Amino acid sequence: MLMFVVVGTLALRKPCNAQRRPYVGVVGGVSTLSADAHTDLDSNSATTSSYKPENGPTVGVFVGLHWNNYFSIQGDYLWNRNLVTLDSLAASTTATGARLYERTFQSRQHTALGSALLYFRPRSSWVRPFLAVGTGVVHLTAEPRSAGIANGISPPGSFSATKPALHVAMGIDLKLKNGWGFRYSFAETSSSNPISRQLTPPGSRMLANFRNLFGVVKCF
């Protein structure tokens, strides 16, 4: 924490020789969504539900401005696609047989973000680790891949939602030649969970999207 405060103080000081420089970049990688589950129990019945996401592709573009040697601002657009399987099972001592469903959905997220980046080395360095914090919006849509399995419980149909999100990331920029560079980052984008609300019974966890991103950056 002390290091973060010291570097942040340096970032806000007016630099002597660092001019503001715009940059753009593209990234791609793997998206991993968080899962959720919920169980209701009483003396006569039990109901459980969950959803299981699969890893999927993610791509993005970004544009930013190196404000000085240690501080930058950046806007991102990110897209990802993930298969998600929802299921529910209900059993009762007063009923014969169990009620259940399972259905797989194709989910897509479109994310727009604005972030502040804090670098730990000056722009003259060829290796520049950074931290990023930002906010934005996430739009999620989910379409059924098939009819699935249902017995006594109706599975949800298509659904969508747009939610505010918090974004944090850590990464590293590697300087190449002629203004080009390589970037790796590990990021988490968190929002309220429209998938959990489709479960029976509903889940309660936030939706987190973890991304491993690799890409190129061009400074002007």
Regions found by a protein language model. Give the residues of each.
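Surface-exposed strand-loop-strand hairpins of Gram-negative outer-membrane beta-barrel proteins
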Residues: S31-V59, S158-A161
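Predominantly the C-terminal beta-signal and adjacent terminal strand-loop region
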Residues: N82-L86, A95, L176-F220
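Hydrophobic alpha-helical segments of small multi-pass membrane proteins
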Residues: A112-G114, L131-V137, T162-I172, E188
